[in-house]
């Protein structure tokens, strides 16, 4: 589910937020996402932001998906790690995008280890309804790969929320 189309003013706002470091825009964008997806959020146990590779996060200074997820007023779990930096998806077609992110994500080993240390309890994501959060959905390749990892780790259901959906996805 997306709150709007990735065009016009919304596209400009997301660009300013993501690439110009205008983190104050997380509040209105997160509010827009929260308002548009209240039914989905009411049925979830937690939200999981799509992770950035550590080098990209260092360069940008923040993870835009995490900033958005914080504003959804639901428990947030950093359940995923991005293992490898992937080339930018911008110029890739749908098939290349899926290949580009294949194997790029794993469930956080800390999450699994913490569960084992506490009497073998299941990881927090097991048997839960999870909402993945990202800024823009284009082909869905990144969200699909993240969902695949969460489901393999035992999530009951994974839904995806984005602020905007690019025309290629509609």
Predicted segments, located by residue:
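Conserved PRPP/pyrophosphate-binding segment of the phosphoribosyltransferase/PRPP-pathway fold
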Residues: 1-133, 139-170
């Amino acid at each position: 589910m997306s709150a709007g189309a990735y065009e016009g003013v919304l596209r400009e706002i997301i660009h300013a937020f993501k690439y110009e470091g205008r983190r104050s825009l997380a509040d209105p964008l997160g509010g827009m996402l929260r308002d548009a997806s209240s039914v989905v959020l009411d049925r979830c146990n937690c939200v999981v932001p799509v992770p950035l590779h550590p080098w990209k996060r260092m360069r940008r200074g923040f993870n835009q998906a995490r900033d958005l997820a914080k504003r959804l007023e639901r428990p947030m779990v950093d359940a995923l790690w991005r293992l490898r930096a992937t080339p930018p998806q911008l110029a890739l077609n749908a098939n290349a995008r899926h290949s580009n992110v294949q194997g790029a994500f794993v469930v956080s080993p800390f999450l699994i280890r913490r569960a084992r240390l506490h009497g073998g309890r299941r990881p927090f994501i097991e048997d839960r309804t999870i909402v993945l959060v990202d800024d823009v959905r284009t082909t869905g390749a990144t969200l699909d790969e993240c969902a695949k990892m969460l489901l393999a780790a035992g999530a009951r259901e994974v839904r995806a929320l984005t602020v905007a959906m690019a025309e290629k996805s509609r």
